[in-house]
Swiss-Prot record:
This is Undecaprenyl-diphosphatase. NCBIfam families: PRK00281.2-1, undec_PP_bacA. Catalyzes the dephosphorylation of undecaprenyl diphosphate (UPP). Confers resistance to bacitracin. GO terms for cellular component: plasma membrane. It holds the Pfam family BacA.
Amino acid sequence: MTWIEAIILGLVQGLTEFLPISSSAHIRIVGEFLPSATDPGAAFTAITQLGTELAVLIYFWRDITRIIGRWSAAVTGRIPHSDPDARMGWLIIVGSIPIAVLGLLLEDWIDTEFRSLWITATMLIVFGVLLALADRLGRQTKPLEKLTVRDGVLYGLAQALALIPGVSRSGGTIAAGLAMGYTRPAATRYAFLLAVPAVFASGLYKLYTSLTDPGTQGPYGMGETLVATAVAFVVAYAVIAWLMRFISTNSYLPFVWYRILLGGVLFALLGAGVISA
């Protein structure tokens, strides 16, 4: 992998991580059209996501520091556990359990079978349709303060599906939130906050394994990966700011059509033998 390829993949990661269109799918697809014509790998994707999640930490720093502070105060008995921010801290922990468990259990599949472009194309279309249905039929009346433990678990299960490229971490969790009746801003905000523990854990784990076992790195060096991560951070911050404004007055339908179109094009390219799965 060249430095130019690393920058391109960092741009792709930053542009697509928080849009409900699957960043892992785009990394996988774009990798096939770069000069190296190869899958950058699950480790590359996970490590570059550290950059995008750093953008979340900075954009939502007031929310995150408040939640951590109030949750810590509740744990030490200084405030009641019913405090809204302390409760949100617990709900983020609960919602992170499914992806943590399944990520460890299915690690080998995530690195191999799940990265088939046939699966990616299918998931792009299927979850695009599900996002459309949720956006169209969801009541969209519940604020984030109405989040329950049950809803937090369902959010977490939806996030776990994003272990399959093409599903989209944000797309899956946002669709789940809309289906449960949450407003677009509420569903989107919780999706971003919920991703922080899981993505940082996954990225740091893959970073550790790449450093201790270079054979797991894939077709890139650590230098190129870190450059891609830095690029992803800058771009992702701008995307978050734009998306939070966009969904306050618009639906997710443009992303739905994009997912279906991309999935269809991918099927055509695979069927014609232009790219390999």
